[in-house]
């Protein structure tokens, strides 16, 4: 059992390292594309300010920017390669990682990052990171 636990912890560590490398490689390309249009920066600022509200969505961003949702979608697809909704979800997940690392419960994390349903949050987190948020949280608890 101890061997299984040690091997699974090592596998998770390798997976997290690979995810970090992937993110580091992808980030400069995304950063370069979003610098081209100040509207992207405005939208990202709105996301950073409102991601924690569950009712916050692409429609909210479009309304605050006084553009149609279609225009906002085209802008994001062209400059970032993601829809505004995808970017918002990614942003929420990244913020949730930080809260889990600080020891916040899965339910508190989900609600703090704009997910109304902690079970939905867990499914999305697991699909994105390959492990449930509870395991991710425990992994950082063991390190500290």
Positions of predicted regions on the chain:
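Short, Lys/Arg-enriched anionic-surface-contact patches
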Residues: 31-39, 82-88
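…primarily DNA-binding HTH/wHTH and HhH modules…
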Residues: 123-144
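Pre-recognition alpha-helix immediately N-terminal to the DNA-recognition helix
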Residues: 38-46, 88, 92-95
């Amino acid at each position: 059992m101890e061997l299984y636990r040690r091997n699974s912890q090592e596998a998770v560590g390798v997976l997290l390292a690979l995810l970090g490398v992937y993110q580091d490689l992808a980030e400069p390309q995304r950063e370069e594309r979003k610098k081209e249009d100040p509207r992207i920066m405005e939208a990202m600022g709105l996301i950073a300010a409102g991601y924690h509200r569950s009712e916050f969505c692409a429609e909210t961003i479009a309304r605050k920017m006084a553009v149609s949702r279609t225009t906002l979608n085209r802008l994001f697809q062209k400059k970032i390669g993601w829809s505004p909704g995808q970017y918002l979800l990614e942003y929420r997940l990244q913020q949730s990682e930080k809260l889990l690392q600080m020891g916040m419960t899965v339910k508190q994390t989900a609600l703090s990052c704009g997910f109304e349903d902690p079970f939905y949050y867990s499914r999305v987190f697991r699909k994105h990171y390959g492990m449930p948020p509870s395991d991710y949280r425990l992994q950082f608890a063991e390190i500290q």
